[in-house]
Regions:
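Ubiquitin-like/PB1-type beta-grasp interaction modules and other compact soluble beta-rich domains
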Residues: 2-11, 16-136
Length: 136
């Protein structure tokens, strides 16, 4: 009986350890880690996120998606609402901003310039640097 209980306990311990050892894709609960590489695909770009306190996280996104928005949505890094102008991004890397509530919004940048297109209408350019910055 004691040997059987020891065996069962050992099996449970092994299963718990296997569950804890699962590979991390760099995104946990919609938050990409600084320096992480997330996704899979032939194209890659750098993503910078600057929060309302000035904190900056930079990570690499690999994708086969056609648009930056699709690539980030697929990884769970952004979320928002569809509008007649496209995707209104409210959450980036786990932080939600809503202009109607807090007077702040996520501004989208392409290679350091304020974007003239929305994230869901911006094609993925291999090697580009895209950014979301919290702004008033």
């Amino acid at each position: 009986m004691k040997k059987m209980m020891t065996g069962v306990l050992a099996l449970v311990l092994v299963l718990v350890m296997v569950g804890c050892g699962q590979e991390d894709n760099g995104v946990v609960n919609g938050v990409a880690k600084d320096g992480a590489t997330i996704g899979e695909g032939a194209k890659s770009f750098t993503m910078e996120v600057v929060d309302k306190d000035g904190g900056k996280v930079t990570f690499t996104v690999k994708t086969d998606a056609d648009t930056v928005g699709k690539a980030l949505l697929d990884q769970g890094v952004i979320a928002g609402e569809d509008s007649s102008y496209g995707l209104y991004v409210k959450t980036v890397n786990g932080t939600t901003l809503d202009y109607d509530t807090d007077g702040m919004y996520w501004a989208f940048y392409i290679n350091g310039e304020y974007a003239q297109t929305g994230v869901d209408a911006t094609g993925v350019e291999d090697g580009a640097v895209y950014a979301f910055r919290a702004e008033k």
